[in-house]
């Protein structure tokens, strides 16, 4: 088988709804030499991501799917800055100025990326504010900003804040005794401009409020106080509205949300490290606190506060992105799944069972006999189901004639059927070996956890070949047949299904 989001001298409930004049910095465009005909890899990715964003503006795409595409474009851009932009900044810091095959030096490349990315971010928020939110409101799906809250909703917000949010917040006044803290990568934070004197008689200044990751970024509004079938408020709006209650005796004259993106790459030398897993575990502890590469801040944040934040994160003007909305659009990604509106989503796709395999799923034939009579077999995913491959591992786990199972795992959650059946096979006394690629980017921690789970089940776990990344999907089942050992092999590409069904 083969598989292929405010300067307010007095706080008001008014929130901006348009970005107004462009706040993008002046960044010189970079033009490659005329005799260079190769596209720049990073600019090519940004062009691809622009096509993703275009789907969020495509009226032929179901509305909730358009929201999902907006979130995907945001997630893509985050990862792009964490890895690609971070790498370019490291080259510049290291004094590397040689042009690449596309004719651009690292600094020219960064200038071109910045110019494109600023325009892209502005388009993202125009898509959200001017297109998607109004269209969702027409479908009785509404995100309520502070200036739209009536008395009942304001009372509910206060109660929700007091009971579900305030207990986990730890406001921090910024002064010589309380310096600017280390903020984790992509976390939601608020910088507060205070006036007055605190309980200890100290003059006010700036304060910081961090929103823990455990808090949901979008909160559904109870239907008895909501004018829409599906009503939501942003966590940032709730915290912003209640900021005065957190600073006794002081007046928050400005509240501004921001997010910092950091270098998220892991640096492990294949030649020097003796234990790849232990080295990755050590690097993972530092991932959330890498060098800052981008600052996203509320569009109406005053320059003095932006400059203060820039100094804290050692960022230049071109690294600052003013946004007119929530600083992490990706946190809207669960909304489409929470709303039961099939008319606003793609129709569910059910892959077909290849005719070659239909008999094995009604218990009429052993899959090994079936495959041996028809091998080789080509399966075309996702149009054809992955079930035959899962069935092969399921039957192998309980077949007394199977002696060994060997499989590669790249991005596979602990709830995968493959993991379930491999553990069953090991407990049944079969020799099970799994190659886990620990360096599957942003899945390293999950894969380390998976490796521990498999080892606890008696499975031999290895971590691939030093210097290479194991991306192919391979499976070998060794079975005794008529006094011979026969191998059943599956080779493919893509990720393995991760859900129990």
Regions found by a protein language model. Name each.
Residues 2-501:
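N-terminal localization/anchoring segments of enzymes in phospholipid and broader phosphate metabolism
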């Amino acid at each position: 088988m083969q598989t292929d989001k405010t300067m307010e001298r007095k706080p008001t409930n008014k929130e901006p709804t348009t970005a107004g004049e462009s706040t993008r910095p002046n960044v010189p465009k970079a033009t490659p030499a005329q005799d260079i005909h190769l596209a720049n890899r990073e600019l090519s990715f940004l062009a691809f991501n622009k096509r993703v964003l275009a789907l969020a503006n495509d009226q032929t795409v179901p509305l909730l799917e358009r929201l999902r595409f907006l979130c995907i474009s945001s997630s893509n851009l985050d990862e792009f800055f964490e890895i690609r932009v971070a790498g370019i900044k490291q080259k510049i810091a290291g004094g590397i100025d040689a042009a690449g095959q596309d004719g651009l030096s690292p600094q020219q490349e960064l200038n071109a990326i910045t110019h494109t990315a600023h325009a892209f971010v502005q388009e993202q928020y125009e898509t959200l504010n001017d297109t998607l939110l109004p269209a969702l409101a027409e479908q009785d799906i509404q995100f309520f900003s502070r200036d739209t809250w009536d008395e009942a909703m304001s009372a509910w917000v206060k109660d929700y804040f007091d009971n579900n949010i305030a207990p986990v917040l730890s406001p921090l006044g910024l002064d010589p005794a309380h310096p600017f803290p280390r903020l984790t990568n992509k976390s939601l934070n608020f910088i507060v401009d205070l006036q007055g004197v605190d309980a200890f008689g100290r003059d006010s200044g700036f304060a910081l409020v961090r929103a823990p990751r455990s808090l949901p970024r979008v909160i559904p509004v109870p239907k008895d106080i909501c004018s829409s079938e599906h009503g939501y408020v942003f966590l940032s709006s709730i915290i912003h509205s209640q900021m005065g209650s957190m600073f006794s005796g002081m007046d928050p004259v400005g509240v501004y949300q921001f997010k910092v993106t950091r270098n998220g790459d892991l640096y492990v030398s294949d030649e020097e490290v003796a234990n790849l897993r232990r080295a990755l575990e050590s690097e993972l502890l530092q991932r959330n606190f890498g060098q800052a590469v981008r600052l996203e801040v509320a569009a109406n944040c005053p320059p003095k506060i932006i400059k203060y934040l820039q100094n804290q994160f050692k960022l230049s003007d071109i690294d600052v992105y003013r946004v007119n909305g929530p600083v992490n659009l990706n946190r809207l990604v669960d909304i489409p799944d929470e709303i039961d509106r099939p008319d606003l989503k793609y129709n569910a796709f059910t892959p077909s069972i290849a005719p070659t395999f239909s008999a094995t799923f009604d218990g009429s034939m052993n899959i090994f006999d079936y495959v041996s009579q028809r091998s080789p077999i080509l399966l075309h995913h996702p149009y054809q189901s992955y079930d035959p491959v899962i069935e092969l591992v399921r039957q192998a786990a309980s077949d007394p004639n199977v002696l060994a199972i060997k499989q590669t795992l790249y991005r596979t959650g602990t709830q995968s059927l493959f993991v379930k059946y491999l553990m069953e096979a090991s407990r049944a006394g079969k020799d099970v070996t799994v190659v886990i690629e620990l360096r599957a980017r942003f899945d390293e921690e999950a894969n380390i956890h998976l490796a521990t789970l498999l080892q606890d089940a008696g499975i031999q776990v290895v971590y691939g070949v030093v210097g290479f990344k194991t991306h192919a999907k391979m499976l070998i089942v060794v079975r005794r047949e008529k006094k011979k050992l026969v191998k059943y092999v599956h080779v493919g590409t893509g990720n393995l299904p991760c859900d129990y069904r």
